[in-house]
Amino acid sequence: MEAYLFLIGLVLIGVIAQNKSLIIAAAFLLIIKAIGLDGRLFPSLQAKGITWGVTLITAAILVPIATGDIGFRELLNSVRGHIGIISFLAGIFVAIIAAHGVGLMKEDPLVTTALLAGTILAVGLFRGVPVGPLIGAGIAALVIGMWDIIVKAISG
């Protein structure tokens, strides 16, 4: 019963915040649970959902290449100015950080729970976009790594 109430609450937060992604995701899970397919679908969705989501986002990003709107010339021209170079480097940095985040999320379920809570808050109240768990986990992994180094240095 708690899961139903939680999902209904998320739908309501999505409605209040006018966040279609949160509404659709929570309603989808609510429907799957209500019709009794949760036992069959949730394990696969939980195990592979992030990979599916990243794949879908990647496909959406690649559409301009597939349509011919972006070719090799545009790609090369995009990194000639300072904005392009900074964006290029930011893309590299974020991808590396997110890779570390995936590992952290798989290692510790509590990290995933805390990130989920933060992401729900950001999506619901600040009109955030729920790509945050991967980046959030990557940033958390980076900060945790730095924390460990500092603690080791202090404790000798």
Swiss-Prot record:
It comes from the Bacteria. The keyword Phosphoprotein does not apply. It is a multi-pass membrane protein. The chain crosses the membrane at residues 5-25, 52-72, 83-103, 109-129, 131-151. Keywords: Cell membrane, Membrane, Transmembrane, Transmembrane helix. It is found in: Cell membrane. Pfam families: DUF441. Its main location: membrane. GO terms for cellular component: plasma membrane. Belongs to the UPF0756 family. This is UPF0756 membrane protein Exig_2210. It comes from Exiguobacterium sibiricum (strain DSM 17290 / CCUG 55495 / CIP 109462 / JCM 13490 / 255-15). The lineage of its organism: Bacteria, Bacillati, Bacillota, Bacilli, Bacillales.
